[in-house]
Amino acid sequence: MSTPSVQTFGKKKTATAVAHVKAGKGLIKVNGAPITLVQPEILRFKVYEPLTLVGLDKFQNIDIRVKVSGGGHVSQVYAIRQAIAKGLVAYHQKFVDEASKNELKKVFASYDKTLLVADSRRMEPKKFGGRGARARFQKSYR
C-alpha cells in the first residue's frame, strides 16, 4: 500500500502550485530543488512563513513536494506558500487530529488570510481611449 498523502494547490494571479504532502523525513522540495534554493532570494522568507509560524517540529515527519507553473516570480512564491500551508492543514485533518488542524488554521489565519484563502483579484482588461484600464489620454479643448 502507498504512503498516506494529500494533494493541495495554491494560486495567485495565473501561478498555480500543487503540493503533495506525505509521511516522510522532513524533505521540502519545490520543482525538484530544496526549498532553500527558491528564487528570488528576497522573497525566500515568504516561502518559509508557513514553516516558521507553526515551528519546524511539525515538519519533521512529513515530506512536501511542490510543483509550480505559470505567473511571474512573485506570484509563484505566494502560490507556493499557500500550497504548503493548505497541505499541512489538510494532512493534519486527514491523518493527525481535528484539534491540531484547527490550531494550525487559527495560526495561519491570524497571521495572513492569504495563506489559506486564494486572492481573487485579477488584472482588469485595457480599454480603448487610454493607456490602461482606467487611465485616459489627455483631452484638449483647443
UniProtKB/Swiss-Prot annotation:
GO terms of molecular function: RNA binding; structural constituent of ribosome
Assigned GO CC terms: cytosolic small ribosomal subunit
Pfam families for the chain: Ribosomal_S9
InterPro entries: Ribosomal_Su5_D2-typ_SF (IPR020568), Ribosomal_uS9 (IPR000754), Ribosomal_uS9_CS (IPR020574), Ribsml_uS5_D2-typ_fold_subgr (IPR014721)
GO biological process: maturation of SSU-rRNA from tricistronic rRNA transcript (SSU-rRNA, 5.8S rRNA, LSU-rRNA); translation
Keywords: Ribonucleoprotein, Ribosomal protein
Domain of life: Eukaryota
Protein family (similarity comment): Belongs to the universal ribosomal protein uS9 family.
Protein name according to UniProt: Small ribosomal subunit protein uS9
Organism: Debaryomyces hansenii (strain ATCC 36239 / CBS 767 / BCRC 21394 / JCM 1990 / NBRC 0083 / IGC 2968)
Gene name of the record: RPS16
